[in-house]
Amino acid sequence: MDYIFDKFTEWIKNLLVDGIMNNLSGLFDNVNAKVSEISTQIGSTPQAWNGNIFNMIKNLSDNVILPIAGVILALVMTLDLIQLITDRNNLHDVDTWMFFKWIFKTACAVLVVSHTWDLVMGVFDVAQNVISRSSGIINGTLNIDIASHFADLETRLQAMGIGELLGLWLQSFIVGITMWALSICIFIIAYGRMIEIYLVTSVAPIPMSTMVNREWGQMGQNYLRSLFALGFQGFLIMVCIAIYAVLVQNMIVDTNVSTAIWSCMGYTVLLCFTLFKTGSLAKSVFNAH
């Protein structure tokens, strides 16, 4: 009877050890892949990230939004002319210079609207240049490999009791599900930012058509601030990833396997939290809303 019980105990222990090793071997693979992917994607301009989407958005902007922006521009400049004339003592003090001033403002407004796409892409080209230069300064591995810190991990697991192994297997399983969810969060941040860029750029002519007007100009100015916030959000993401890389490189793994698993996951949770904060931080820096 003792022989049968020992064999059953050994079988359960081997099953738990194999399960723990399998859970730990690929525990951080998805997160490592997503972190490497996001560090590459944030350095891409809208046209380089996906050419098909870029062309579609540009066609929509040129063929659908630009005519609407032209109507808004005509309305804004007409109101501006009326205000310019009535401000001069109700037409009793009209001078010809004000018409030249209005013609100059209108010409500038038409120039801005007709070159909106170039101006918008210029903002992201500047941001991409900043990110590329920062990536040359920031170095370091972004990968977490928990198994590499425990060369004798399987031997140590074999020395544990069934209760300890069962608890460790349950922890590794829970952490594995959590890491899968975190990898999805990183994916959402990377792709969500690029989709937001495409959405914002698609309507660019409308806010840009209000730039030269005193009352309506706040719309265009806030739009430009939003563009810079979106562009430089990539730089903040790069800084977050750099801090994450330093933490991973200097990670002191505890001799306790359970503590090591949770500490590694803690770094990844911290990364996700800071990545989600980059959008609001960039908007607050550029006073965009």
What are these regions (language model features)?
Residues L75, V120, F124-A127, C185-I188, ...:
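Membrane-embedded alpha-helices of multi-pass transport/permease systems
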Residues L81-V94, S183-F187, R214-W216:
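Membrane-water interface regions at transmembrane-helix termini and the short interhelical loops
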Residues V175, M179-M211, R225-L247:
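Alpha-helical transmembrane segments of helical membrane proteins, especially in multi-pass transport
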Residues P67-L79, I197:
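Hydrophobic alpha-helical transmembrane segments
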Residues A74-T78, W180, T201, T274:
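Hydrophobic alpha-helical transmembrane segments of multipass integral membrane proteins
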Residues M1-I72, R88-W97, A107-T178, G217, ...:
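Gly/Ser-rich, low-complexity
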